[in-house]
From Swiss-Prot:
Mg(2+) binds at E163. PANTHER family: ISOPENTENYL-DIPHOSPHATE DELTA-ISOMERASE (PTHR43665:SF1). This is Isopentenyl-diphosphate delta-isomerase. GO terms for molecular function: FMN binding; isopentenyl-diphosphate delta-isomerase activity; magnesium ion binding; NADPH binding; oxidoreductase activity.
Length: 342
């Protein structure tokens, strides 16, 4: 078991290093540059009156941003997550934690969150578990993950391509829909479904809407591509390496995935993420109808430096969003919906 934990920690460290490599970014497929907002030369408003307030789980929130789930369960995670949570405590951003899978078998792993929650009790956090683990995990154990974190909601992440290419991948997803539907019915916390860089089809989103999930985090193609990352890790497995190269552009991009969701007029909230690198990208997602926007790689890069760098990144994104709103004559986020170029 100890050897398994050592391998787990090494895999998580690999993920951090590889996630920052340009080769593992599907930025050449990023759609944001091909989507524009209508410029307003005479915006009849005062910049200081612009509001970026949004709604999350039917309640108003001051900031419409989250740090998308990244890393947990290894020795380097504590410092990274401390900086991220410290910054969130100052900006009122929310945060999805990395996978809590290890906590299911290692009781000590849960103590990672004790000092973080002690120092930052007011930060809105979301628990996180993979769909493959959900299938075989009792609801009571999942509830413990939420309780340990004092989480506002639970993220279930879906990563079929990553699991196929990861040397240690879990590729048995049979029963995932049944398990997900049971979870939504039995657990009190809001359930968020998140992809990990490959986006969502309209049919999948329709099924998610029918079972009553609270939110879908799009995480489409255009940002960090986990198929590419696992291909780099599978350097002793030529079959997985070649497969990673074949599927290097696999998935549905963030804007198309968001449009797929909007077209359904769903009951779930649409959270835009996947290749979002600045506040202008965020503005475009709000214009399409997202109510929350998530950032991962930009925050990870900053958190490897300092809390100050994370705060600078957050403040810049907020200012860029407000600049996009001012230059389109949008006083509130909903106004952006009328400013998308046809």
């Amino acid at each position: 078991m100890q050897n398994e934990y050592s391998q787990f920690e090494q895999r998580k460290r690999d993920h951090i290093e590889l996630a920052l490599m340009p080769a593992n970014q599907s930025s050449e497929l990023n759609p944001f540059d091909h989507f524009s907002l209508v410029h307003e030369a005479l915006p009849d408003l005062d910049f200081k009156d612009i509001s970026i307030q949004s709604i999350r789980f039917k309640k108003p929130v001051e900031k419409p941003f989250i740090i998308s789930s990244m890393t947990a369960g290894h020795s380097n995670a504590l410092e990274i997550n401390y900086r991220l949570m410290e910054a969130c405590s100052k900006t009122k951003w929310a945060m999805g934690v990395g996978s809590q899978r290890r906590e299911l078998t290692d009781k000590q792993a849960a103590f990672e969150w004790t000092p973080l929650r002690r120092d930052f009790p007011m930060v809105s956090l979301f628990s996180n578990l993979g769909i493959a683990q959900l299938i075989d995990t009792p609801i009571s154990a999942i509830q413990r993950l939420i309780d340990t974190l004092q989480a506002e909601a639970l993220i279930i992440h879906c990563n079929p391509l990553q699991e196929c290419i990861q040397p240690e991948g879990t590729t048995n997803f049979q029963g995932c829909w049944t398990a997900l539907e049971a979870l939504v019915k039995k657990i009190a916390s809001p359930v968020i479904i998140k992809e990990t860089g490959c986006g969502f089809s309209k049919n999948t989103l329709l099924r998610l809407n029918n079972i009553g999930v609270a939110a879908v985090e799009i995480s489409g193609v255009g940002g960090t591509h986990w198929g590419r990352i696992e291909g780099h890790r599978a350097n002793k497995d030529p079959i997985r390496q070649r497969t990673a190269d074949t599927f290097r552009n696999w998935g549905i991009d963030t804007l198309q995935s968001t449009r797929n969701a909007i077209s359904l007029n769903p009951s779930f909230e649409i959270w835009g993420s996947g290749g979002v690198r600045n506040g202008l990208d965020a503005a475009k997602l709000f214009a399409l109808g997202a109510t929350t926007v998530g950032f991962a790689k930009p925050m990870l890069e900053a958190a490897l430096g300092s809390t100050g760098q994370v705060l600078t990144q957050m403040n810049t994104i907020e200012y860029e969003l407000k600049t996009a709103m001012f230059c389109t004559g949008s006083r509130v986020l909903d106004d952006l919906k009328e400013k998308a170029c046809p």
